[in-house]
């Protein structure tokens, strides 16, 4: 497989990445902390690709990235009011909440747990990709399991070139 390198400065970046996500592919996406390895969090086959690409144990649950507060109830239930207050105060940003999962969230995403982790990344391009894909994106850090976190597209390229569908380059100087 040839890995595409998509510049966040390109108007087609989000659309291309979202289409890859919608068709079950893997895209490395930027967050405010590290690059994530993203796939459709509701598509079991796509989620399994994340575990395979990372060499991640399947008993390690994934985080669902969403566009905002309005999506919490789509994937979670029995949500305490405090969760909405936290999301209002800290999203978008590096706050992850673990809440009871709806049945629509695959067991492979939650590692069989009754809960799911949700967060709203503070990256405009990543939220745009999530919105255009129309699904939450399961995205653990893009590093190979056990290796240091991937903070640049170059790190992602080193670990995954030819093994994932695309890398969204946050900065043009981040070119792999």
Each model region followed by its residue ranges:
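Active-site-adjacent structural elements in enzyme catalytic cores
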Residues: 1-173
């Amino acid at each position: 497989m040839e890995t595409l390198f998509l510049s966040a400065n390109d108007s087609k970046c989000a659309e291309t990445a979202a289409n890859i996500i919608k068709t079950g592919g893997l895209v490395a996406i930027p967050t405010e902390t590290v690059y994530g390895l993203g796939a459709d969090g509701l598509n079991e086959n796509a989620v399994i690709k994340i575990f395979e690409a990372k060499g991640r144990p399947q008993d390690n649950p994934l985080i669902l990235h969403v566009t905002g507060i309005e999506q919490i109830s789509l994937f979670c239930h029995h949500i305490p009011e405090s969760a909405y207050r936290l999301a209002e105060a800290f999203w978008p940003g590096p706050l992850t909440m673990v809440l009871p999962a709806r049945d629509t969230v695959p067991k492979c995403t939650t590692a069989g747990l009754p809960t799911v982790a949700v967060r709203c990344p503070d990256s405009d391009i990543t939220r745009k990709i999530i919105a255009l894909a129309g699904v939450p994106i399961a995205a653990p850090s893009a590093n190979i399991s056990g290796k240091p976190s991937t903070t640049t597209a170059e790190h992602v390229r080193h670990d995954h070139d030819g093994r994932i569908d695309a890398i969204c380059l946050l900065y043009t100087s981040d070119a792999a």
